[in-house]
């Protein structure tokens, strides 16, 4: 398969989808059946081709997808992809309309984002699912402490069309041989999730963390660079680039 990004300057990359299929299957076997595999296909699947990589991942063991922006989710829906799609980025007014219309799962972490989504839901007369992002040490977006989690939950209680179905965080340093900070982040995440309703989808581990820390797999992992064959270590899975 040859991948050319829209509006590129004619450059292309020859992608071996058999390698991606192999990697997804290998990771799927390693995780076991109790852990969902979310394939991260943001940024045109890291330059590998959004649609073919997403389809290949879903055909070989991924149960859902993650993108950075709602526009990427819309492209997947237009290509016929019906699997759950999580938007990892922050809520914007325009993006909220797309997430609601296309049935995407939107990341939220503060009252402003929840209200923006509720307004879009009300205009379209349909609900939207959300996952609550918790910043446990990465230093990007996310509710950072119990007060911010309470504020987000209060906003959700006032937004009947915005439905909380999951929560997640991201390890800042998962490939560091010293795993003490990763363990600290995980403990902080688990403490904050005690404030949330039971039965949510919880995910903390991305590629390296999911392979290195079985204790961090919870009920979902996000696989990005691993499915493209280039984690810091393939942990004996013989992943193919």
Protein language model regions, located:
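A charged N-terminal "starter" segment
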Residues: 1-105, 111, 163
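Active-site loop/helix belt of alpha/beta enzymes
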Residues: 8-9, 43-51, 55-60, 115, ...
